[in-house]
A protein has these predicted regions:
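Ribosome large-subunit tunnel/peptidyl-transferase-proximal elements
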Residues: 1-108, 118, 136, 141-151
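C-terminal structural segments of small proteins and small subunits
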Residues: 120-130, 136
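Hydrophobic, well-ordered secondary-structure segments
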Residues: 106-107, 111, 124
Length: 151
């Protein structure tokens, strides 16, 4: 008796098909852009998604300087860090961080949406953020996609 068997496909480093994707951040809201980029990096839009494998795409983000924050977040949102010394807690507002380096806003938002382990660190290395419209990954021929088409 022959039965139909649907086996679960588990990806590994040999069977993963990684692509280069170009995302334009011009006019995009920070959180919505970051969550979709984190899903792209993680590989959740692919049918062979496997949680413990780096099966996502390499993502290049351009125009990070044109990102949008809603409400009063430019003034009220704070990024806190600690120097490691007693009384060494420091904080920056979103505006101050943006003036120092516009790419850090997107990088911190996406990194916070990835797993907090070795896989998350490896996935974060698949993200390339540029403040302007030019990028250094032209040799990889990234495919431009519209994030509004993704769920």
């Amino acid at each position: 008796m022959n039965t139909l068997s649907y086996k679960t496909v588990s990806a590994n480093s040999a069977t993963v098909n990684k692509e280069w994707v170009l995302v334009d951040a011009d006019g995009q809201t920070l959180g919505r852009l970051s969550s979709k980029v984190a899903k792209l990096i993680r590989g959740k839009y692919k049918p062979n998604y496997t949680p413990h494998v780096d099966c996502g795409d390499n993502v290049v983000i351009i125009n990070a300087e044109k990102i949008v924050l809603t409400g009063n977040k430019w003034r009220d949102k704070s990024y806190i860090r600690h120097t490691g010394y007693p009384g060494g807690q420091r904080s920056l507002t979103a505006t101050e961080m943006f003036e120092k380096d516009p790419t850090r806003l997107i990088e911190k938002a996406v990194k916070g949406m990835l797993p907090k382990n070795i896989l998350g660190a490896a996935l974060f290395r698949n993200l390339y953020v540029y403040a302007g419209g030019e990028h250094k990954q032209a040799g990889q021929k990234p495919k431009a996609i519209n994030l509004n088409d993704l769920k």
